[in-house]
């Protein structure tokens, strides 16, 4: 997308506070960049975003930031997508539906958990705290979270990422149970591994390629037409039904 509009892409990996302190002053002082896309959604990113906004730099945040009233961002409707995924499980007849959430320090984790709760509540299904475990978007985290959930005997699990779903399904198999016969799963992201897992994963597909291209389009709009008012773009998702949800067993 950058090449299409005659811009050059520069990539900066900022994984620590030290990285932030070294990289961003150079960007601001030397005028190296016309604009910046920040991959966000974590509470700790708010300071970085704030510095860019205060400097009146064109900024697009990929992933809704915690404070979004004065900065442009592009995202999906995580609440709606999670709600639709859980409602699909409810439609298959599951009632003891657990969730492995994302970190509570991220808007993604918070929003997808909210969607899970919204779906259950709209169908008058009681919210059981024993069926909600916080994860960390890693396979190991998904495995550990599923081990914590197994004593609560969930019929189905909505995981906030495919990577955690892979770990969680492995924990189910290691416990001598079967997917989806004993525990069904729905993930989130539709990464390539979703279709390559031992049991192909039903999951929410994000428009990853379009997401990046749209972020660049919005950034160029900010550069060429001014940063006010902020632009907000919500991309669509879709549920991809595969074997892990048990639809064939229940259909």
Residue ranges and their predicted role:
Residues 1-87, 151:
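Alpha-helical recognition/docking segments in bacterial nutrient-uptake
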């Amino acid at each position: 997308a950058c090449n299409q509009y005659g811009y050059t892409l520069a990539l900066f990996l900022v994984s620590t506070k030290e990285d932030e302190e070294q990289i961003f002053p150079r960007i601001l002082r030397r005028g190296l960049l016309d604009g910046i896309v920040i991959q966000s959604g974590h509470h700790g990113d708010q300071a970085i975003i704030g510095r860019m906004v205060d400097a009146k730099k064109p900024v697009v945040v990929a992933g809704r930031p915690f404070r979004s009233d004065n900065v442009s961002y592009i995202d999906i409707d995580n609440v709606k997508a999670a709600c639709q995924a859980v409602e699909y499980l409810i439609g298959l007849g599951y009632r003891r539906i657990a969730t492995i959430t994302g970190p509570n320090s991220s808007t993604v984790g918070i929003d997808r958990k909210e969607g899970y709760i919204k779906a259950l509540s709209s169908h008058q299904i009681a919210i059981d705290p024993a069926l909600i475990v916080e994860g960390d978007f890693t396979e190991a985290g998904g495995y550990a979270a599923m081990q914590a959930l197994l004593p609560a005997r969930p019929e189905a699990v909505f995981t906030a990422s495919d990577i955690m779903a892979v770990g969680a399904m492995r924990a189910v198999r290691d416990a001598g149970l079967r997917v989806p016969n004993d525990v069904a799963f729905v993930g989130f992201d539709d990464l390539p591994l979703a279709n390559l897992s031992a049991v192909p994963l039903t999951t929410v597909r994000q428009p990853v390629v379009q997401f990046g291209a749209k972020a660049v389009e919005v950034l160029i709009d900010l550069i060429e037409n001014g940063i006010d008012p902020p632009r907000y773009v919500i991309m669509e998702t879709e549920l991809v039904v595969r074997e892990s949800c048990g639809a064939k067993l229940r259909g």
